[in-house]
């Protein structure tokens, strides 16, 4: 084959072209990766996050006030945004415990388990491994109750409910012993010391709010505690609290109405201490979630003619979407016809759990039909390990009337001693108890979602899809 000068020129041109393409190819293979933008958080969420970063460094009332500010900021965020921003928080973020509690209170799932290495954690000690359903009770249980003193009447149903759950369980059970707190601070500390000295590896109680604070403040909890009330002191690491507080009724009622887009509420309330606490919690939660208390009308033991006051409330700009009845059953029954005459009979009506104790004489004429109220799940559905509420009431005085709520509370206290580890470590761990669905937040507080019921004549019936 011949090779001339013309061919050499083409070869040089081709080589130059290949070199240029090669250089260009090398230049374009370098890929610059830019970091993805951080998710944009709701302004209130970002403000709450800033407060949470400093929360652990605070103490006393400053810490309490900071926690309240965080909760109020989160309360004003809608469900979808709260869930989205919660999922964006990195592991270990101090805001997650607050956000998780807000999600649980709204009946929403957690994006991941609580970060148990921080504010609160559970230690099973030397308990045998858990069963497949999470059952892992302590080895020896000490129960602190006021078997004497002003709270002894309440302690009886709690004790009987606890023992009903204990003896219904056929698997391994702890040794159990009861210690009288005498409803005093000194008696509580002495009872705790006796339980620990006797070998208890878990302590249940005390029942009084002041006694819970005394124990949590003592700095002597060598054995963890599940307190049966909620005081002003948060549970120490490893301990927890479970309560049936009036504040829970108020907060649950507010969530119930907000979920049903009924933000403008007329409040009817009597003046006892429990009612005042429920109404205060209702107002705070409703306002934090964007609602308004249109008016609050005080009710005496025998309500008179409220027509003028009801008419004034109805005629306010924006009207009334719902009525919150923080009343005893007889008061609610007496007012029901007046609500109808004022044009409020067709509005959403929600009451506190007091309505669950209405007698058949108050409900038989259907005047209370349609009023929603939080109740023990046991009253409207079967609970494993317990006979029906009606059957138990026919056999046990401590499971009748108002005592039935405390009986169910005692039963759930037993469940919590056995399933607390599962609740602590599973993102959506829960126990279907006699008082409702039980979960635990990132601070060691048991969060209870009640069953919602209404009356159909003399019978309490469950409300489907009724949670907040």
Predicted regions mapped to residue ranges:
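C-terminal motif of bacterial Sec signal peptides marking the signal peptidase cleavage site
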Residues: 22-25
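An alpha-beta-alpha
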Residues: 239-298
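Short beta-strand elements at the ligand-binding edges of bilobed clamshell
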Residues: 233-256, 365-377
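Bacterial signal peptide processing site
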Residues: 27-30
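Extracellular/periplasmic periplasmic-binding protein-like sensory domains
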Residues: 320, 336-411, 425
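Segments of small-molecule ligand-sensing domains
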Residues: 389-466
